[in-house]
């Protein structure tokens, strides 16, 4: 049996990249999936570690690098063609390199040498990103914290070319952050770029020198990005380095200076007219140009709102013409890229081209795009990956006809932990669900998504019905159980293949059965019951009717206290599903039904038990109703204790329960043979059931097990990420041991490994679901194993044939000499035929059994009536006048509610600007005062509660501290010092309330010890301190000369503090005074010579020694008790202080959550307002573009004057926008920020407010070159302005600011210019960096330069001068500004047409002014948004810190609860068992522990004690073996001595003739005769036994014939009984009909009388109601106000609010203080 990976379903939500023209790669669990988009074929590359952190691909050379997770990660390089490893790198072993000289260590440059080692190894605890160079020879590795290093490898030789830490950000001079992405320059392997948060953006230069290489970074220039923006991602382009910012901007950087690239104005004039005419009259603005059309200064290549919502840019990718920008809001926008040379400039570089929609509903889904890459066969396909597990493919080029481009879904996978995987009941698919709340159906053959159902909450349990019912059940974390109807897998597969909508998973049943998450769901084998168990300790049984489509809860039962169900299985018996078990039984559920008739469900409990639940036949029938209101279910429950808790259980069909296989908490697989006797199920406290067999399975405990449908294979998976395949004897299959281990390590171990495994309905496929959200499908096949064996035999035969051919001719065998074993072939054929016949017979028997059961069920439950009748009754409609009154009251209430909703508040009774009497005002004042008093009283009550609790804790701690002090005093009296760990400082909580005086005394006052700086002391104060010091010294000298204490000690105690009475201490009750004579001797009691003292003194000495020994024993016991009390008191005070700290943290956390909620709501409101402004601005821009496009249509009749009108239409004056409404200072100042810029002849807005930059790229790489180009452009612009003014019209303004070079403080560190793509090849492909043909140029080689730097700069400057001069010459004829339109009317133009043109142009100017005003409003709206976001982020981080502190505190408390120390003192050489003592009644220092804690600790102690006892037993057995071996050796020696003695006796014995005969024959011949007689007797008895056996068989056949005849007679009797039953039923029906005819007349008479009485009562009530209505109408006319009609409400003024003054404000309305202020 072999196991092979079939498909991998999962996407980690991270990096996705192209590996070929039609193949892409992403991470799935602990593997990299290489997926072919066309054929949907997959190749899976398994990681070698615990997980995969990142990977990199080189498409040109077919390389793949994988970085594994771990504290010492390893980077492995593979070939994408063969998936074989090529090299392995260990970044943690790289040592920091020195520069090798002072010249290579400039301050702050971070220069590092790559050839000399001078420091210790680096600390690389993780790898964040990888990148290959374009030539495939170099690999860049970026390490995680704490080093945050960048390492460049020559990976083929495992050589480190350069290593350096990430530079610190400008805001933080010391802290660094790791890079999130890295990439080499596509044409130069010595240049690479990094980007990431916290200043990780830099361009790195690796410059090889003579003996070393300098590796240094160049960071961003100061002010290169807008304030508050950080670089989030980057991408190399032909024009420079594109970077995305955290504020949604796109910036093109010059790699020589790391400043934004300067883009100059492009040609205008006639070229501009042509472009404008082609686009409908709209062209891109050129900043800095005059209104007359002269080309002005340059602008920076910055698009501030590349992501319109202001969200961060998460990914960048590009091709030759376009740049795709992906945002954190899910939007993907495509811009025109900046070309590499002036000859290839597009009309609008960095202008918005179009958008890519990830969904049909709109441009953004709210889910960020995590990764994006452009590739494919033509390098024009965009591949996008999102963190929600989806992957999309879209064309990067714009769609014909304009509009957004739609994407195609490639992959849609789970996100987060999977709850389970089960087979589809119909086969051909697997079902999964997980924490993302979705239920999905996957194909077993290719892993395609066949169906999907999104639910509202995370799902925690999953079960599928047995074959025959297409049902599945899911349980959520909220306790909701749903039953889904599954579509057939074949139908879903055909829909998925034809791109049709996937079939829906219909919800058949939904009900909240549990108050906690659902743990286990399981169907019965007959699909008639569903069991659900949750963490609330409740298990529910539901009746399932698969045929009728109904699910109904039957009842619930409670689990054992404190237990939780870990796994469940419902085994089926060998004889069938138990359909014939007592369905006709009636009455309530009974627990006394015969055991063994109904199938039982086995539940594995967390406490190490097994629970057997047997449902009666009535529950299986589907017609039983629970008679109890609390839905309590009475079923048969049996409990069994196991030796270890089973985390997952699977059963094999058997006679009763079958054999159960489980994955235990001890990381072993167990085989359980469950007892069939009820007495063996003795409960959870009985002796545990030992496993029949157990073997080590996995390295981690949690996981799952599954049994194949045929019951011949067992699969297991665990948290170590491995999947194992075993036979039913728990032996690992040899094919898996010797194979590639397809199921080993495919899941991410750091995420949790394998959650569960499952076979499909056929047993051919195996699936494993992981905590990393990945699903792997494996194929089990014997063909591979047989093929391997056959290949081995073929290779062996080929070797033999080759050896035969190589042998000499005389020794060579011919074909005829090769013998074929014909007998073996015939035997194999016979065996095959026998097996086929046996299988056919078994299948036929199974079919007959199924037909029989179907017929029985059909006869039992069939009902010919498909539709049941029902009784329908209605309610009488009320009279018309009541309807009118009800409509009036409803209308009045709607008016009041509309008024309150319009005002936004519910008033207290007074309305602004209305006149009220003094009494009403006084009442309002009293009401507000009462509310203030209520609020104050509530606050005081809460404050007093908190103060009382704090004071109680402080008193308790003070009592415990006093108790600690007393215990220490007692220990010191006994002369025993306390342990070192119990001498810490005392715990305390300040019970003082924080009043104003206390705050002023503690917070607002600074004590001297709090001042850290040196204090200034004046000379007077210094002299005063010196005098005080001298006085103290004199007093100390006087006290030393005549000390009163010493004098008193000499006079009263004789100069010593020793106790009188021979060393007896009166305060110590355990000290015994020595006898007087012993004190006189002055020796120790043990050193007294008995011969020197009398017998009386000797006896007295022994008595004293005995008393002293007993006192010392009592003293030791007392010390032990005091130390225990000391530990108990310390534990209690620590618990109190930790609880107080936890309460404080919880209070702070609540306040932080409340503040965070307010900040989030305010931020959402601001964002909504900002989105509205952005939509308004976009609409204005669309209106402008529409007017520009419709210009030619509006004035098509102008004929020859159309070009002149178009020129006048585009002309602008600066004062025109300033004079329009809304176009004042805001519009003038904010024009550049909003994207509306003055151009040479027009204004243009691109969609979404992105500025369209009509400019060209500057190729100057030095400050001098850029300045020269700017100077030439300025001169050309000045000349053009002069030419324009000489034409008769006054110039409008200056020519603009000249181009400025890079900042003066930036020094380029690279020694040569970056290479450019080959122009001839770049024009034929969309790849921005195509491969150059051989011999074209050397730009694609790392570190090479085709031209000298001076030559390169000279040519670039010449191109710039030529371009600016041509631009000025082209714009010279269009520099005439417009002051008065009336004098510019073309001759021959119709006056009406001219007036219409003037009005149209005025409308266009108004639209431009409105756009500028909207841009100004947008700038103001965006101003406070970053501050609100930062405040929300700060509150969120504060909440995380508080939650971390609370979690750490609870963890410490839990560790302290387990960290107990028990001192046991035993005498040497023996174990003393102390008699039990009565427990103390004082429970003040007792600690309440949960029963589970004590039981868990007892289990730990019992386990350790058991291990110790087993060691002692093993030692005893080993010694017993030694003694037995010694005894056997001694016995052998004794036998040898006896044998030697016998031999010696035989040698000395006298030899006779008889003796010689015995020695010669060996034994007596009579024994042979006796053996012959016995054999004859045995043969005779065998013949008699065969004869008797034949007689018995004959009698047995006769009895069988009698039994068959009796059965036939019984069948005839049964038929006769059925006939008699039918006759009896007919007689009973006739008698019932005759009796019912007599009763019918009586019932009819009674019904008539009752009907008459009811009519009289109804008439009386109707009259009474009429009188009441008349009285009510009279009262209404006197007292009730006039009602208004619904049609007159809209024109009525707002009536005053008539609400009583005591109505309180609703939640969420303005505060009472604001209402009081308005009052």
From Swiss-Prot:
InterPro entries assigned to the protein according to its UniProt record, in alphabetical order: Quino_amine_DH_bsu, WD40/YVTN_repeat-like_dom_sf, WD40_repeat_dom_sf, WD40_rpt
The residue ranges flagged as biased composition, category Polar residues, are 1709-1719
Report the GO terms under cellular component. axoneme; motile cilium
Keyword Coiled coil recorded: yes
Bias (Low complexity): 1257-1269, 1344-1358
Give residue spans, biased composition: Gly residues.
Answer: 1221-1233
The record's WD repeats, renumbered to this chain, cover: 122-165, 174-214, 226-263, 308-345, 413-452, 513-552, 697-736, 749-788, 1073-1114
**Where does the record place a coiled coil?**
1524-1609, 1651-1679
Q: Where in the cell is it found?
A: Cell projection, Cilium, Flagellum; Cytoplasm, Cytoskeleton, Flagellum axoneme
Superkingdom of this protein's organism = Eukaryota
Gene3D superfamilies of this UniProt entry? YVTN repeat-like/Quinoprotein amine dehydrogenase
Q: Where is this region: Disordered?
A: 94-120, 569-596, 1022-1045, 1220-1269, 1277-1296, 1325-1372, 1685-1719
Q: Briefly, what is this protein's role? A: Flagellar protein involved in flagellum axoneme organization and function.
Q: Which family does it belong to?
A: Belongs to the CFAP43 family.
Q: Can you say what this protein is called?
A: Cilia- and flagella-associated protein 43
